């Protein structure tokens, strides 16, 4: 089986994530896309008002009608700071005989050499770089594949900011995720009394 790994905070998951997963399915002939929500990413802070279970619930809602997309909670179970090399080790134990593709955006790829044990990563999986912010292909000494995906100019941080500022986000999120955010009062300004 050909399996793509998409790690991220998914805070919240949005249509850009799902669109990229669909592009990956098509462009790389992928049998399964595994979304891996990070526990505590090494290079990013997560809003403390949104729990791990909130993020997983939103992912479940976003993927409920997708037959090739699944969630793996290995980073959540392992806890602590999340490093990609450790995530891959966990995934490889479950999918021993499958071909694994690690998908990262070019925004992350530009600093890939500073990641924990990048050589081990490229030795374990096919590193696939997706356009996220750059139209041109970045160069690197690390073995990688670039896909010519469409750039969807959206980010979870932009969505959170729009919600805080009372701006519409309905066209940026799967319906179930939008409803969950509203029902659970996520990402809104907390008023101190």
From Swiss-Prot:
Domain of life of the source: Bacteria
Keyword set, alphabetical order: ATP-binding, NAD, Nucleotide-binding, Nucleotidyltransferase, Pyridine nucleotide biosynthesis, Transferase
GO biological process: NAD biosynthetic process
Enzyme Commission number(s): 2.7.7.18
Pfam family name, one: CTP_transf_like
Enzyme class per UniProt: transferase
Catalytic reaction list: nicotinate beta-D-ribonucleotide + ATP + H(+) = deamido-NAD(+) + diphosphate
Keyword field contains Ligase: no
SUPFAM superfamilies in the record: Nucleotidylyl transferase
Coiled coil regions, renumbered to chain: none
Pathways involved: Cofactor biosynthesis; NAD(+) biosynthesis; deamido-NAD(+) from nicotinate D-ribonucleotide: step 1/1
Keyword Amino-acid biosynthesis in annotation: no
GO function terms (MF aspect): ATP binding; nicotinate-nucleotide adenylyltransferase activity
Function: Catalyzes the reversible adenylation of nicotinate mononucleotide (NaMN) to nicotinic acid adenine dinucleotide (NaAD).
Sequence similarity: Belongs to the NadD family.
Protein name, per record: Probable nicotinate-nucleotide adenylyltransferase
Lineage, opening ranks: Bacteria, Pseudomonadati, Spirochaetota, Spirochaetia, Spirochaetales
Record gene name: nadD
């Amino acid at each position: 089986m050909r399996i793509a790994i998409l790690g991220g905070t998914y805070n919240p998951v949005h249509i850009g994530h799902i669109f990229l997963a669909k592009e990956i399915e098509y462009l790389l002939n992928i049998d399964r896309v595994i979304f891996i929500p990070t526990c505590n990413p090494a290079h990013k802070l997560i809003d403390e008002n949104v729990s791990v279970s909130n993020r997983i619930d939103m992912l479940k809602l976003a993927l409920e009608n997708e037959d090739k997309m699944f969630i793996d909670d290995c980073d959540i179970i392992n806890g602590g700071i999340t490093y990609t090399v450790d995530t891959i080790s966990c995934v490889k134990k479950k999918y021993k005989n499958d071909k694994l593709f690690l998908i990262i955006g070019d925004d992350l790829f530009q600093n890939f050499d500073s990641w924990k044990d990048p050589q081990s990563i490229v030795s374990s999986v096919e590193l696939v770089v997706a356009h996220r912010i750059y139209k041109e292909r970045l160069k690197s000494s690390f073995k990688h594949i670039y896909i010519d995906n469409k750039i969807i100019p959206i980010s979870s941080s932009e969505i959170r900011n729009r919600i805080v500022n009372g701006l519409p986000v309905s066209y940026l999120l799967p319906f179930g995720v939008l409803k969950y955010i509203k029902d659970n009062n996520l990402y809104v300004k907390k008023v101190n009394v």
